[in-house]
């Protein structure tokens, strides 16, 4: 919102520019004034929207031309003053002043000020004035209005500057086509969206209650009964197709229908006693035509629109910082709002949103589309047998969106009208300035009460931050969150997609189709008597490496689900190699899953079999042990896979290689042992390594290489890669370094 307004007065000599400014300041007529008065500043208390106003006088003499041009370029609004007693000063406005301003490249509102009205001889009708001004306003669209005044009487002096302020704070040009006398398309689109958001029951009408909610939201006060009646009388009396409906002694508000003969049932502005969208647009057209632009602008700004009639970034993209180790979830307010809009758009009351109902729900969003284009929605969440999104699936989908990209959730909460009227309530107080009346009462151009435009409500109240994982670990090891993220990794054809589809209740697909793009699904899972939302993601061969190389993305996962085909001899080697290639995987909570248990078990081509591998990692998962978990999606045997993933996410200690605190080993009691082994290798070479092997009774050929920490593993791995060109000896050294690093972990059992 603008904080200041700069008004520049221009015009021919002796038209009274300086006298007008002096009369405003002195609040009285001053006969002798300076030719050019210094700039004055009006405090925010005397201006709409509490802005600071600077008024600048200028001279039209040739010697001051440079200063005149500089001030015109700095102006937010220009008042061209002419003298009613000197008709030539008015004639020069369209022939000199307006073309001259355009030649400077200045595009700001212009107010025409007819001064010295006290010197006019005879009466002039409004029609005559309009005829005189119409050609000028038709040719020069920057002309907002014309005000006649007198500094001597005085008359309308403060109104001159008030209308100048209004021209900046509530501009006409973005809203109204003064040549065609219609609302501009962007304004129509914005007002239609606002109408739909205020139509709480989605019946295409604004009832008395909805109009009152709208009034409270925008102006912080309810409508009185007579004001409601006045609105309806006003919109019904508009000429429609050449016909004008008169109601004389009848009350539109009381009639409500055509039964009493007062209102034709086909009237486009009012139906069944409620305001239609056409009536809503007509009402705002009247506001603008009668000089009440502040009313329409207040409505637009309340719903987040800026001067360009697009939703402001501060509304759609509010600041919401997410500290490390924290995640974002919907707050109770957010879940309530999403539940409310689900229920109001579920027109057939079948507990699910069909495609048509979803289209209706997102009609207030950009391009009338939901944010999940190209993601497989609604198959990514829970649907009924017809593919319609259930309430459970709807809330789950938004929980996933908030977890993965909370900015999208914030934007769509704004598009969908968060908060709803029941959530926002009335925030009025005795100290709130008087609002602008919704009905445009009073003569055109009359001055309404000043007010501050309310800001749109912040959408961040619909979200909440979770506690950092480290904080949760200190508090009895349990993570206090309700939405968890799991990455599903494994070789092609191992059954990852089947696991994801099964979680959201989709049928098993016999035909194999390789995953070409990232796939995300979400569902509710019962875990320890609580309902959790579990998000599972599969990346496909094209994107898997990209995600695993990105530390930030990988660290966002709560659980890594390693999937292998128990009937394929090469399947387990893929995930074993993956863990060695991306060492950070070794430090993350993990669950190993053997799929296709309905097929014959195959011996895996790997140094050790999967069950031995899991035991040697030191995994102790509640209800499973080390693993792996054997399942068959084809036979419907999932063995509480999803509940187990949530259990690990809540308390990951037993699912991490060697225990949850192994990252601290370099700073614990084994630090001396770790560096001692390093010294032995450096000083004694191969002999020292042989001694270590004898003392610790570990086979010299051991190449298991289970890393003790992500940082240590990464360091040794980079060294091994650097020595890779050195032939077979380099490979052996890398293996010995891996062995020493592995031995330094206090959590790896001696049976390895």
From Swiss-Prot:
Q: Where does Ca(2+) 2 bind?
A: 346, 348, 350, 357
Q: Which residues form the EF-hand domain?
A: 186-221, 333-368
Q: Which residues bind Ca(2+) 1?
A: 199, 201, 203, 210
Q: What is its main location?
A: mitochondrion
Print the keywords alphabetically.
Answer: Calcium, GTP-binding, Hydrolase, Membrane, Metal-binding, Mitochondrion, Mitochondrion outer membrane, Nucleotide-binding, Repeat, Transmembrane, Transmembrane helix
Segments in the Mitochondrial intermembrane topological domain: 693-752
Cytoplasmic topological intervals: 1-671
Q: Name one GO molecular function term.
A: GTP binding
Coiled-coil blocks:
none
- Is Cell inner membrane one of the keywords? no
**NCBIfam families attached to this UniProt entry:** small_GTP (TIGR00231)
Q: Where is this region: Disordered?
A: 426-460
- Domain Miro, first and last residues per copy: 2-170, 481-651
Where found in the cell? Answer: Mitochondrion outer membrane
Q: What is this protein called?
A: Mitochondrial Rho GTPase 1
The way this protein sits in the membrane is described as: Single-pass type IV membrane protein
Residues binding GTP 2 are 490-497, 526-530, 595-598
> Member of which family?
Belongs to the mitochondrial Rho GTPase family.
Gene name for this UniProt entry: GEM1
One cellular component term (GO) for this entry is:
ERMES complex
Q: Which InterPro entries match?
A: EF-hand-dom_pair (IPR011992), EF_Hand_1_Ca_BS (IPR018247), EF_hand_assoc_1 (IPR013566), EF_hand_assoc_2 (IPR013567), EF_hand_dom (IPR002048), Miro-EF-hand_domain (IPR052266), MIRO_dom (IPR020860), P-loop_NTPase (IPR027417)
